Design a protein with these regions (language model features):
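Glycine-rich FAD pyrophosphate-binding loop
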Residues: 4-6, 20-44
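N-terminal Rossmann-fold NAD(P) dinucleotide-binding loop
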Residues: 12-13
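Conserved dinucleotide-binding and phosphotransfer motif residues
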Residues: 22, 88, 117
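Glycine-rich active-site loop/strand segments that organize a redox cofactor
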Residues: 46-94
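Short beta-strand to alpha-helix junction loop
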Residues: 69-79, 96-116, 124
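A conserved short coil-to-beta-strand element within the FAD-binding core of flavoproteins
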Residues: 124-133
Length: 133
């Protein structure tokens, strides 16, 4: 099956990588010049990957409509996020507040890991501000 992912941010690249691993042909449309650029400014340039807690603990701290996230966090809890990045060669550390960062303290390492995860996807820079499907 052909899969189109609109947006090459962290979530879009995660979706693209998952689709690739299911054997789909994947195209990612991204309006920025390079995918996952915003990752570089998260966590003061270090990228807070996730929190080291269970899905239930995570949802307990969501103030607005936690039920919306229930199924996705049940299927892909924080521990799986950590396992994924470690499998992509990123060493992780847990800091105050159970926040998880790359040991390197460089968000670029997370960005590069996501690009490796999507290796095989067609990533197209379209420059579009609006997209009609």
């Amino acid at each position: 099956m052909k899969v189109l992912v609109v947006g090459g941010g962290a979530a879009g690249l995660m979706a693209a990588g998952a689709a690739l691993r299911q054997g789909h042909e994947v195209t990612v449309l991204e309006h920025m010049e390079k995918p996952a650029q915003k990752i570089l400014v998260t966590g003061k340039g270090r990228c807070n990957v996730t929190n080291d807690c269970t899905a239930e603990e995570f949802l307990h701290h969501v103030r607005t409509n936690p039920r919306f996230l229930f199924s996705s966090l049940g299927a892909f809890p924080p521990a799986k996020t950590m396992e994924l990045f470690e499998s992509l060669g990123v060493e992780l550390k847990v800091e105050r507040g159970r926040r998880v960062f790359p040991v390197s303290d460089k968000a670029e390492e997370i960005r590069q890991a996501l690009l490796r995860y999507t290796d095989g996807a067609d990533i197209i820079h379209d420059g579009a501000k609006k997209l009609l499907l």
